[in-house]
């Protein structure tokens, strides 16, 4: 592993441990040339995924881009970063285990919306507004109508 401070390849792992959900291994490293300490994360990648964009272009799947788009949707929302990371891992696992090496951006968007809907309604609407390219207020009203009709269908817990 190359040192991010001096670019030396002479680094050593000082500590290695799994994260809470055991999906990622956290490694604490030290550069032998400059003594700079840094952390890396290692996760299993089942297969190389390619995203087919709406214009037909093919690009490698970028987990970090998914994280950034979710963080934008969840900005100033009361959702713990651990829950976001768990959701991202679940989405990536679902994509990788789908059997296809190439996945359309539409499918990825639908899967993300499914996960966001169960996590945070406001983030869901924010993501949907970009993903579905909302142009008018009635587009927001339609999504809000979907959410409220789902809420009406949910059983109300009994109070004791």
Swiss-Prot record:
UniProt keywords, alphabetically: ATP-binding, DNA-binding, Metal-binding, Nucleotide-binding, Repressor, Transcription, Transcription regulation, Zinc, Zinc-finger
One Pfam assignment: ATP-cone
Cofactor note: Binds 1 zinc ion.
Cofactor: Zn(2+)
Domain ATP-cone: 49-139
Zn finger region (unnamed): 3-34
Bias (Polar residues): 1-11
Gene Ontology process terms (BP): negative regulation of DNA-templated transcription
Region Disordered: start-end pairs: 1-20
Gene Ontology molecular functions: ATP binding; DNA binding; zinc ion binding
Similarity comment: Belongs to the NrdR family.
Biological function: Negatively regulates transcription of bacterial ribonucleotide reductase nrd genes and operons by binding to NrdR-boxes.
The protein's name in its UniProt record: Transcriptional repressor NrdR
Taxonomic path: Bacteria, Pseudomonadati, Pseudomonadota, Alphaproteobacteria, Hyphomicrobiales
